[in-house]
Amino acid sequence: MLGIDMELILQPSLPHQQTGVDAVADVFANTAIKSPVMFYANPEITLSKDGVGQNIVAIQKRNSIQPENCAYFHDASCLNLDIKMETGTGKTYVYTRTMYELHKRYGINKFIVAVPTLPIKAGARQFMEDGYVKRHFRDVCGYDAEIELLTLEPPKKKKKGRQYFPAAVSEFVKGSNRDTKKIYVLLVNMQLLKVAKNYMLSRDDYGSVTEGFYRPFDALRATRPFVIIDEPHKFSRDQKAFGVIKEEINPQCIIRYGATFPETVSGRGKN
């Protein structure tokens, strides 16, 4: 039997992929950005109708988005962006490159990537940790930074003894915005996004703390992250996991990538 080593071949600037990257990054062009007070937090982007709102309208027109798909509802606390990409067109590549681009343009260095299933989680992890992928973004795309991926896993069952703050969350939070060559990414599957007694992200009785935080959800909230959601049709706004992201993590921005998006009912119609 022959052993064959195969490397993923990536092509830079495929038109549909570049369009997806620019569509997100351009949303924040010429908007007010406040420098973070704490070393573990993202810069704070001002979400105004005159800034972000006008940019979104211009991007939709530029990309000839159909009027029925151009809804924009202003929310000053959290911006929600939906990026439609057909299956097999490189969503993982696009959202990974988008993180690099947002870091390059605006200094955003804390991202949480939420996926619906373990196979998708494994695929995303393999892609972002791959040496060839890292070299591609550095040497071909010219990004002067590297992703440090922290993957959240369920805790091993312990009958007795001290419980420790989740290591992936701790390392993610401790990542400093002063290190301009690092982009910190926390990868989670939706089953871990729960609020329940003694559950890993919502409990506050750990034997250690991270930057003064006893509760992992509170620590994540303090980083003011951007959240990326893959496969939103499996991760609808009506599900508890999405509510946990909104209420417990309270990100500045939620970016959903998918081929289909679940409909939500409003009054007698659907949105």
Outline where the language-model segments fall.
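Walker A/P-loop
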Residues: 74-98
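Signature of the SF2 helicase/ATPase Hel1-core->accessory helical subdomain module
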Residues: 93-104, 118, 122-126, 190-271
